[in-house]
């Protein structure tokens, strides 16, 4: 596992999916399913936008962190890895 915090968090999410650790928020999300997690991504996106417009920079950072976490859970449910996203971003940078 790399030192990248995104990769570390994704690995933890995969572990939670595998072990279904009781009391884990990640497990709660997984049990509720992809549609629920997708809805949470939308909610967190809206909260990040609002924070960027009318709240502090720290609050914006917190909301972006929530958004990234929920995106990673959705990615795990879709079997998409951070490396898949890194590869696509690198491809786009070459254009």
Curated annotation (Swiss-Prot):
GO biological process: L-histidine biosynthetic process
Record-listed E.C. numbers: 3.6.1.31
Location in the cell: Cytoplasm
Pfam families hit by this protein: PRA-PH (PF01503)
Pathway(s) the chain acts in: Amino-acid biosynthesis; L-histidine biosynthesis; L-histidine from 5-phospho-alpha-D-ribose 1-diphosphate: step 2/9
GO molecular function term, any single one: phosphoribosyl-ATP diphosphatase activity
Alphabetical keyword list: Amino-acid biosynthesis, ATP-binding, Cytoplasm, Histidine biosynthesis, Hydrolase, Nucleotide-binding
Predominant cellular place of this UniProt entry's protein: cytoplasm
GO cellular component term of the entry, any: cytoplasm
Disulfide-bonded cysteines: none
Superkingdom as given in the UniProt entry: Archaea
Catalysed reactions, semicolon-separated: 1-(5-phospho-beta-D-ribosyl)-ATP + H2O = 1-(5-phospho-beta-D-ribosyl)-5'-AMP + diphosphate + H(+)
Family designation: Belongs to the PRA-PH family.
Descriptive protein name: Phosphoribosyl-ATP pyrophosphatase
The organism's taxonomic lineage, starting at the top: Archaea, Thermoproteota, Thermoprotei, Sulfolobales, Sulfolobaceae
Encoding gene per record: hisE
């Amino acid at each position: 596992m790399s030192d990248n915090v995104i990769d570390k968090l994704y690995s933890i999410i995969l572990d939670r999916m595998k072990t279904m650790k009781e009391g884990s928020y990640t497990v709660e999300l997984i049990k509720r399913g992809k549609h629920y997690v997708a809805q949470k991504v939308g909610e967190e996106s809206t909260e990040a936008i609002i924070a960027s417009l009318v709240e502090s920079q720290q609050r914006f950072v917190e909301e972006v962190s929530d958004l990234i976490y929920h995106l990673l859970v959705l990615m795990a449910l879709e079997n998409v890895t951070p490396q898949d996203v890194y590869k696509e971003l690198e491809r786009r940078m070459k254009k």
